[in-house]
Amino acid sequence: EQNTLKESGYKKIMKNILLERVDYMDSAKQLVKQYGLNSKIQFGSGKNFGEYIPETDTITLRKSYKSVKDFLMTVLHEIKHALDAKRLGTKKFIKKYTQAGTMAQYDGLDPHDDNKWEEKAERFAKQELSKWM
């Protein structure tokens, strides 16, 4: 039954993606559900592709992306953060994420780009992308 649910969710996502203009909100909500999460989705402004806010379990996305691939990579990346926060608990996730950023900065690296949690989320997104494209 689990596979049937995933397949029907997959078909719905693919149908949405094939529309002339992708409904990012609906597609993101469907993806979040496929990973067993209840994270909220909202649109924001700014230069970031996306952001996960663990305190409110919210994924913030841009209103548009250069390609469907960029959109999917962003949503999947943020889903990984949400999965980690769910697995560890919000407070523990925030603590570990912040510590990793501090350690990167201490080593003269970027606290965001060189944060091991960001690297894990990017690997997860690349690994999962083929399921949705």
What is each residue range found by the language model?
Residues 20, 127, 131-133:
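Charged phosphate-binding loop/patch that engages nucleotide di/tri-phosphates or the phosphate backbone
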Residues 33, 50-51, 101-106:
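Short secondary-structure boundary/capping segments within folded domains
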Residues 76-84:
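Short active-site segment of divalent metal-dependent hydrolases/proteases
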